[in-house]
């Protein structure tokens, strides 16, 4: 799980290559293994998450054997939440990451160690932004079940990662978990993340990634393509959506290339950490 850093120079070269290729196919993008028009992808992805919203959390448990919980704890640990922070969790509709950030901020032990006063605590705002209202509704219901329906620290916002409604330099932190591979233009989402963060703000992305160990990769591919779609059909009654989710991972840039894209968005101190041999990776960076 060693951290790896990336240079801006490599990022520029890779981004230029990607831009050249993109210019040849400027009106096409990937939806899983399919090539679709850019204007169609958002609707297709929206349909996927509308279909899976009600079973999204339980499927995460089943598909990962519960490991996604540990991965998200790792993500939040790297964020180091603090009282009074303004944080944006993008593609976070069901609230899984936001609730962990909330719990970290409001932890009695953490507050005692940091000598936090109540006034600072009340200034905390965690914005949960998702383009899909069905996913947000699941999150709001979960908040109600936790007794947080009217909590002022949690704000639910329907919005697009590529065109955020938040002010420049307004956020202390930005997280996106298992979401950025579903946007049509990753570069735009990264640019928006950079725009809304304050100087010194932290960017953190948890995403399914590329396994680097050959033998493990073969087993992982077998599990992904033969087991996960069947689980989707059995548990969620939706094979096609989970087939897309599996395929979308393979179309997502490898760890080094994605790190370079983050650097080219303007971020500094770009690093990534592979978990479970690269099944997932956490990319982190700072806006200086």
Swiss-Prot record:
Record-level GO cellular component terms: extrinsic component of mitochondrial inner membrane; mitochondrion
Keywords noted in UniProt: Membrane, Methyltransferase, Mitochondrion, Mitochondrion inner membrane, S-adenosyl-L-methionine, Transferase, Transit peptide, Ubiquinone biosynthesis
Alphabetized PROSITE patterns for the sequence: SAM_MT_UBIE, UBIE_1, UBIE_2
Membrane topology summary: Peripheral membrane protein
InterPro entries: SAM-dependent_MTases_sf, UbiE/COQ5_MeTrFase, UbiE/COQ5_MeTrFase_CS
Presequence boundaries: 1-27
Enzyme class, first EC level, given as a word: transferase
Domain of life from the UniProt record: Eukaryota
Pathway: Cofactor biosynthesis; ubiquinone biosynthesis
A Pfam family assignment: Ubie_methyltran
Similarity comment text for this entry: Belongs to the class I-like SAM-binding methyltransferase superfamily. MenG/UbiE family.
Protein name listed in UniProt: 2-methoxy-6-polyprenyl-1,4-benzoquinol methylase, mitochondrial
Organism: Arabidopsis thaliana (Mouse-ear cress)
């Amino acid at each position: 799980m060693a951290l790896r850093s990336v240079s801006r120079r490599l990022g520029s070269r890779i981004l230029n290559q990607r831009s050249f290729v993109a210019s040849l196919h400027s009106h096409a993008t990937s939806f899983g293994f399919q090539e679709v028009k850019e204007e169609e992808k958002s609707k297709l992805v929206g349909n996927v998450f509308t279909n899976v919203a009600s079973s999204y959390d339980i499927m995460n448990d089943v598909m990962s054997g519960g490991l996604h919980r540990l991965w998200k704890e790792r993500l939040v640990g790297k964020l180091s939440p603090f009282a009074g922070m303004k944080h944006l969790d993008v593609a976070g509709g069901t609230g899984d990451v936001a609730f962990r950030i909330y719990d970290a901020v409001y932890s009695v032990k953490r507050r005692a160690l940091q000598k936090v006063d109540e006034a600072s605590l009340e200034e905390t705002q965690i914005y949960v932004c998702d383009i899909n209202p069905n996913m947000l509704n699941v999150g709001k219901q979960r908040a109600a079940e936790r007794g947080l329906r009217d909590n002022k620290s949690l704000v639910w916002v329907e919005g697009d990662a590529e065109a955020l409604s938040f002010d420049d330099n307004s956020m202390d932190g930005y997280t996106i978990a298992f979401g950025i591979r579903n946007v049509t233009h990753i570069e735009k989402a990264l640019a928006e993340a950079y725009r809304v963060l304050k100087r010194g703000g932290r960017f953190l992305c948890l995403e399914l990634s590329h396994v680097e160990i050959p033998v493990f990769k073969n087993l992982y591919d077998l599990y992904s393509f033969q087991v996960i779609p069947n689980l989707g059909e059995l548990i969620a009654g939706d094979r096609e959506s989970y087939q897309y989710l599996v395929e979308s991972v393979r179309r997502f840039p490898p760890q080094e290339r994605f790190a370079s894209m983050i650097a080219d968005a303007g971020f500094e101190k770009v690093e990534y950490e592979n978990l479970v041999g690269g099944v997932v990776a956490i990319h982190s960076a700072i806006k200086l």
